[in-house]
A protein has these predicted regions:
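Metal-dependent phosphoester-hydrolase catalytic domains
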Residues: 165-182, 188-269
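N-terminal, active-site-proximal structural segment of metallo-dependent hydrolase catalytic domains
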Residues: 1-62, 80, 168, 261-269
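Structured beta-strand-rich core segments of catalytic domains in phosphoester-bond hydrolases
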Residues: 1-5, 45, 49-136, 243-247
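Acidic/histidine-rich helix-loop elements
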Residues: 10-29, 132-160
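Soluble or luminal CAZymes and related metallo-dependent hydrolases
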Residues: 26-30, 102-104, 156-170
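Active-site environment of divalent metal-dependent phosphoester hydrolases
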Residues: 15-18, 51-57, 79-83, 106, ...
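Active-site flanking residues adjacent to catalytic metal/cofactor-binding acidic residues
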Residues: 11, 49, 126, 185-187
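Residue-level detector of structured alpha->beta connecting loops
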Residues: 42, 91-93, 179, 236
Length: 269
């Protein structure tokens, strides 16, 4: 019941590669563990990034079987490293669904429209460009060829620094043309001091700032320093709780927030 609060989860599942665990699980076993965890959490809206599959045609059947009662929107890009993308699951039936393809990138954003507590909302599930730098591989490469590694790392960072603001602008352009209230979630791959966060958090509440505690780190490899996953909600919403769930199915931690909607303010943004 939306009047009792809406529970939202955002989680970069890291392509089900389980990099931090000593357990030798296959991607399928890791995916099953993640889905079992999400099913147990029983959130109203679930936004996943870096959802990996070998067979895109089987994604809907797999999720429909494992997550009964959820409306499903997904899109995966086919790459030479496999098929991965975003998934949005909701207890509310979607009125409309779509995706925003980021230019020159396999990253993307999904959007889904719902009626929440009698009002129209659009949920954005975003995965913005990362630096594509593995800390463990970086350390190993520095030992072998310091200068070349520095050059390669600099090139990766420049590409990300250029692409991410453009991707943010694409989402903001869609928001500007959207008549509904908007909630922006996902893996921003950027810190709270960044352009990415500054632009997207304007006129929105950061659920961590409203109800979270501690540093709020969501990237486990640099805990407790790095918060790069967010749930941003309209100012009309009241944030009842925000939690970082320390499950190591991925190099990110899932974040979960419960919000309530105030019907007295009808301004859209």
């Amino acid at each position: 019941n939306a009047t009792d609060g809406i529970r939202i989860i955002s989680y970069n599942v890291g392509r089900f590669s389980l990099p931090q665990s000593g357990e030798k699980l296959s991607r399928k076993e890791c995916a099953d563990s993640v889905i079992a965890f999400l099913k147990n959490e029983d959130a109203d809206i679930i936004c996943l990034q870096e959802f990996y599959t070998r067979n895109p045609e089987k994604v809907m059947a797999y999720l429909s079987d494992k997550m009964k009662g959820y409306d499903i929107k997904y899109y995966v890009n086919v790459t030479d490293k496999g098929c991965y993308g975003n998934v949005t699951l909701s207890r509310f039936p979607a009125i409309d669904k779509g995706k925003i393809d980021f230019e020159h990138s396999s990253n993307l954003a999904l959007y889904s429209d719902y009626m929440l507590n009698g009002e129209p909302f659009r949920i954005y599930n975003c995965h913005f460009e990362s630096y594509n730098i593995s800390l463990s591989r970086l350390a190993s490469s520095l030992e072998k060829d310091y200068r070349q590694t520095v050059r390669d790392t600099e090139a990766k960072m420049k590409k990300s620094i250029v692409r991410r603001p453009r991707q943010v602008d694409q989402v903001l352009k869609d928001i500007e043309n959207c008549p509904e209230h908007t909630i922006v979630t996902g893996d921003f791959n950027d810190a709270p001091m960044s352009y990415t966060y500054w632009r997207l958090s304007r006129k929105r509440k950061d659920t961590f700032k409203e109800a979270g505690t501690g540093f709020g780190a969501t990237f486990s490899k640099l805990r407790p320093l790095l918060r790069i996953d967010y749930i941003l909600v309209p100012e009309k919403c009241k944030v009842l709780s925000h939690n970082i769930i320390h499950k190591r199915f991925s190099d990110h931690y899932p974040i979960e927030s419960v919000i309530s909607i105030n019907n007295t303010d009808n301004e859209r943004h």
